[in-house]
Amino acid sequence: MTRPRVKSYFIDYSLKKVMLDEFLANYFKDAGYAGMELYKTPTGYRVVIYAEYPGRIIGRGGSIIRKLMTIMQTHFGLENVNITVSPVPDPDLNARIVAFRIVRALEKEIPYRRVAMAMLRRVMEAGAVGAEIIISGKLRSERARYEKLKAGRIYKAGDMVDYVVDRAVGKALLKRGVYGVEVVIVRPHLKPPDYVEIKSVKPEELADLIPVEKEETNESISPQ
């Protein structure tokens, strides 16, 4: 009898988390929203919001936070919610922040290729292993197409996708229509599975590793 309740609990919890994440992404797009975490505590819920500009989410004197707490209680059913806003340590390595930057630039009628090249260069200068930016829509004509720019190494499958690859999508509303933006960033990591390191050996170390063959000398035997 308890299994259906446990299953429905986790389904409701996941749906609530996804809906809250989409709401915060649309509401705080200009604040550099980077993601959120939802925790269940003994007294209620705890929400941690990550953003590039935390002050735009907190508001003057916490006014926006208080409104946000009311919205979470009435529309999402989060009773006794505690909200924490944390800054992002590396905004240039966060795919969602980069995608929102591209969206804001496109909505200002900045050429898409210039925006993509500038953001790609900025991500790689921040230390990313690889990055890929895809912009789709009516870019040059009435027919929809896409433009893909990438640099470095991109992982499409395997365990590395779950650990070091960050992906985000966004959409920009223009007069010509809707532009889709997809950003993939491979964050810096220690060693990938296909990493091969060739060590340099000093000459004196090489002499110790390779045995030196001694030349045999033929001693002449003098007759008695």
From Swiss-Prot:
SMART domains: KH. Pfam families: KH_2, Ribosomal_S3_C. One of its GO terms (molecular function) is structural constituent of ribosome. SUPFAM superfamilies: Prokaryotic type KH domain (KH-domain type II), Ribosomal protein S3 C-terminal domain. The keyword Cell membrane does not apply. It comes from the Archaea. This is Small ribosomal subunit protein uS3. Binds the lower part of the 30S subunit head. Part of the 30S ribosomal subunit. Belongs to the universal ribosomal protein uS3 family. Keywords: Ribonucleoprotein, Ribosomal protein, RNA-binding, rRNA-binding. Residues 20-89 form the KH type-2 domain.
